[in-house]
Every structure is written in C-alpha cells, then in structure tokens.
Design a protein with these regions (language model features):
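N-terminal Rossmann-like NAD(P)+-binding subdomain of aldehyde/semialdehyde dehydrogenases
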Residues: 1-125
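A conserved active-site cap/scaffold subdomain adjacent to cofactor or substrate pockets
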Residues: 232-304, 308
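Flexible, glycine/charged-enriched surface loops at secondary-structure junctions
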Residues: 104-109, 229, 266-271, 291-302, ...
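C-terminal core of ALDH-fold dehydrogenases
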Residues: 323-433
Length: 433
C-alpha cells in the first residue's frame, strides 16, 4: 500500500527519511556483461552489432542493412496517420521555439588593466541519441533529445533504435525526420552505445550520447563516459503534487497515476494541507485503477512507491518539496506563482490547475528529459547547453602583461613552478613588440 504520512506525528522525521532513501531501481548487476559487449564491439565492429542484433532482436542484418535507407524511411513515415502527424509537428515546432531561446551569447570586453577577455560558444561536432525500440518506443523522446542538439548547431546527429522482429514505430522515424536527424541505425542495447562511442566500419563515433534505456544501456553509458560525454543516468519517473483546497481531486488522482503508469518503479507523491483532498484523492485513485489499460503497472507503482503527506501549511510543504527535489513538480494551488518563487529544487515546475505534467511531456516546449532520484538538487534537464562548449578567450598587450604579470610570477614561484614564472618574466623584460 502507498505510504500515508502526517508531518505533525512524532515519527514523521524517520518515516520521511525512509521515503527519501527508498531504492526504486532494479538492482541488476550488468556491468560485467556490458564490459564484454563493449569489448567485442571495439574488437569486431559491425560484425559484433550484427551478431548481437540476431541474438536479441531476432533479425538478420548485413553491414549495408544496419542503417535505414531514405526509401525505407519514406515508406515507414507514410504509415503515420494525419492526426498523429499533425500532433508531432506541433510538438516539434514548440520544442524548437522554446530551445532557440536558450542559445547563449558570446562575450568579449577589455578590463581596467587593458586585458581583452571573453568567451565563445560552439556546438559539439557529433551527437548520438539512443531510442528504446519496438512498437512502444516514444517519439516524444526523440524530439526532446534531438531538437536541442540541432538548435545548438550539432552538424551530425545519429540515432540508434532496436527493431525487434524487424518492427519499428513509424512515429519514431517521423520524429527523427522532423528533428533533422542525419543517420538512423537498427541497433540497440549496450552494443549501440559502444558503437556510438568507439565507432565501427559503418557507424562513425560521436562526441556525446543522450537518451534513455534499460539497465544495460545505462551501464554502457557509465562505462563509455570519458571517451564521450553523456547526458545523465535517468532513474524511474517521479511526480510531486502540492495541492490545496482549491484543487480538483479527480484531476490530481489522474496526474499521480500518469507517472505511475510509466513503470512499476515510478513514484507519485501528494503533499496537501487539506484532509478532504487526502480522502478524495485516495478514492479517485482506486476508482481509476480499475479502468486503466495499464492498471497492473500503475497499481504496483502506486502501492509500492506512492505517498500522501498531510502538512499543517505550505511552509512545511515547500520545505519537504525542496528536500524531495522531484523530477516533476505540480503546484495545484490558488497562487502557484507565489509558491514557485520558493522552490529551489525541481526538474520542472507546472503552475496552476490547468497545467498537468502530462502536457509537458509532449507539447509545452520545455524538455522532458529531467533529473531524477533527487538529483535536481544539483543538476538540470536536457537543454541546448548540453550540446555546446564554452571556450574562454584572453589577449594581453605588453602593457597589460606588465600590469598583472608580476602577480602571476609571484604565484608561480610560490607553487615551485619555475618555468611558469620564466615564461611570463621573459616577456616582461623584452623590448620587442
């Protein structure tokens, strides 16, 4: 059963700490297997991808068949109904518009010592996006990962997506087309991550890998980090709803279950100061669980990981929220803007009764790739910035070096780095321009 806590009870502190520290991810030790897969891909290249694809996805490939051809893409994309096509185009346009506003400016100035300083932003050259496969794969995730990369100016974007039994969701391919993806490969699992990181005869290596995946994909991303950049190791999805007496319990129940239906390890938490909201939401959840198409998953998630916390006021609610640092935070209250100003830890905030988290998964514009497992305390969601590098710039004249150089020489000598100091002092003593 879900956890029911009251912040006024004597054992609340202990119970809340247990809620925060509860482990929701499957503890599958796959590191050894993944290390072997990566090693074989490095050693055998395309052949390893072909062998693993036959083993796991039950399809026979050749090096020429690893990549989708233009005609194959066109054939699959034609299968997308007009309603879904229009919805995906709307989502893509809104995501692109939002992320264009994230592009930072370069800067250059001269300080009081005559030193010219600045920074310059430039995109990474190539990025790889992992897309979970099968007919149940999510085209929205393609948009959320690929569009920021293209907006940033990434010149080459490759996607790997497994096609078990040679099946693919056409919406995924349309999303890739709308996002400006350059290459799409029929490869999945840890072997796809290895191919993107180290390259094969067919797949060129990339500089950064993003995208969700199972335990094998997550382990592979950890192991190739350093060779390439990665976005994050995302855990199970989560939502926290802060609700007062003005909220709609029937809506809140659906919002909580919208996360619970993701997977059995997802977490949904409600914090409220209203006893009526507590009672009504509990009832509405039970009613909805009887009718959902994914009721088995949602019920297990809610029973194993769900929580309702009763608080005396929203000062306590905000304190608890900032400690939870949720991936998604809904403020279903009368004055959400006032509350939002006090929130310091959250991946994304959804303000007001008319802003369900689910709409943010698709069409509002902000990215839905967000920090989980309390990592919103120190990290942010995926953005254009994840595909940019900042290079600092500095230029000194002789006069500028004479002004600040002596301090640098002093510091170099204090650190015992003689040649550092000499490289500066020799210039200061020179009369050449």
């Amino acid at each position: 059963m879900p956890v029911f806590l009251n912040s006024s009870h004597s054992n609340f502190k202990k119970d809340f700490e247990m809620l925060l520290s509860s482990k929701r991810e499957d503890s599958i030790d796959v590191d050894i297997s993944v290390r072997e897969i990566i090693g074989l891909v490095k050693e055998q290249g395309d052949q390893a991808l072909i062998d693993y694809t036959k083993k796991f996805d039950r399809i026979e490939l050749t090096p020429e068949k690893l990549r989708f051809t233009e005609s194959e893409l066109a054939e699959q994309i034609l299968k997308v109904p007009e309603k879904e096509r229009s919805a995906l185009k709307l989502a893509a346009a809104r995501i692109e518009d939002y992320h264009k506003r994230q592009i930072p400016n370069n800067a250059f100035w001269t300080d009081e010592s005559g030193v010219e300083l600045g920074w310059r932003w430039s995109p990474i050259t190539a990025a790889g996006l992992y897309v979970p496969g099968g007919l149940a794969s999510y085209p929205s995730s393609v948009l959320m990962n690929a569009i920021p990369a293209k907006v940033a100016g990434v010149s080459r974007l490759a996607i790997t997506v497994p096609t078990p039994d040679d099946k693919i969701n056409p919406l995924v391919l349309l999303a890739a087309q709308l996002s400006g993806v350059d290459e799409i490969y029929r490869v999945g699992g840890a072997q796809a991550i290895a191919a993107l990181a180290y390259g094969t005869e067919t797949i060129k290596p990339v500089d950064k890998i993003t995208g969700p995946g199972n335990a094998f994909v997550a382990a592979a991303k950890r192991q190739v980090f350093g060779k390439v950049g990665i976005d994050m190791i995302a855990g199970p999805s989560e939502i926290l709803v802060l609700a007062d007496g003005t909220s709609r319990p029937d809506w809140i129940a659906l919002d909580l279950l919208s996360q619970a239906e993701h997977d059995e390890n997802a977490q949904s938490i409600l914090i409220t100061d209203s006893d009526d909201v507590v009672k009504s939401v509990r009832k509405k959840i039970e009613v909805n669980l009887k009718n959902l198409s994914r009721s088995e998953i949602a019920r297990k998630s809610w029973n194993d990981n769900g929580a309702i916390i009763k608080v005396p006021d929203f000062d306590v609610a905000i304190e608890l929220s900032n400690r939870i640092a949720p991936e998604h935070l809904e403020l279903c209250v009368s004055d959400p803007e006032k509350l939002a100003k006090r929130i310091t830890n959250a991946g994304a905030i959804f303000l007001g009764h008319w802003t369900p988290e689910a709409v943010g998964d698709y069409v509002t514009g902000p990215n839905h790739v967000l920090p989980t497992a309390r990592s919103a305390r120190f990290s942010s969601g995926l953005s254009v910035m994840d595909f940019l590098k900042r290079t600092t710039l500095a230029k000194l004249s002789r006069d500028a070096l004479l002004k600040i150089g002596p301090s640098a020489v002093t510091l170099a000598n204090s650190e015992g780095l003689e040649c550092h100091g000499l490289s500066i002092s020799e210039r200061m003593q020179s009369n050449s321009d």
